[in-house]
Amino acid sequence: MRPLPHRYVVRLAAGPTGYADVLAGGRPTLRTAPPVEYDGPGDAWSPEHLLLAAVQGCFLFTLRAVARMSKVDFVSLEVETGGTVDRQNGVTRFAEIVVRPTLIVPAGTDRTRALGVLRKAEKACLVSASLATPIRLEPEIVEVDVPVLAGAIG
C-alpha cells in the first residue's frame, strides 16, 4: 500500500434530465440514473446501488488483506449486500446495510478463525467505517474439498 493520505477524484457529466456519466481518470465511463423507486429508468447504476457496491468491493479487498495476514486461505467469496432506505428524523437515508458474505474455504479450515477474518474485514473496511449507517454482517462459511495439484508440495 502507498503511504496515506490517498486522494480520489470522480467527475460527473449530465444534463437537466436523463442519465449521468461518471468518469474517473481513464476508467470506463459509468452510466448512472435514479432507481425506479425515484422514477428512474431502472437500467443503469443508481447512487444507491453504487454505495452498496462500494461496501462490497471494499469488504472483498479488505478481506483479502486480512486473510493473507491471518494466514487463512479461501477458495472464493460471494457477497449479497442489501440496503434499506427510509425516512429517519425527516431525512431520507440508508437505515441499514446488511452484508451477507459466503466464504468458500478448503475442507478442514478453522471456522472460528475464518469467521473472525470476515468480522475483522467488515470492521476494517474504509468505506463501511466512513458511513453513519449501521452495517450488519451475516456471514456463512462453506467448506469444499480442494483438489491437490500434481507436483504440489505441502
Residue ranges and their predicted role:
Residues 1-53, 60, 64-154:
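Extended beta-strand/beta-hairpin segments
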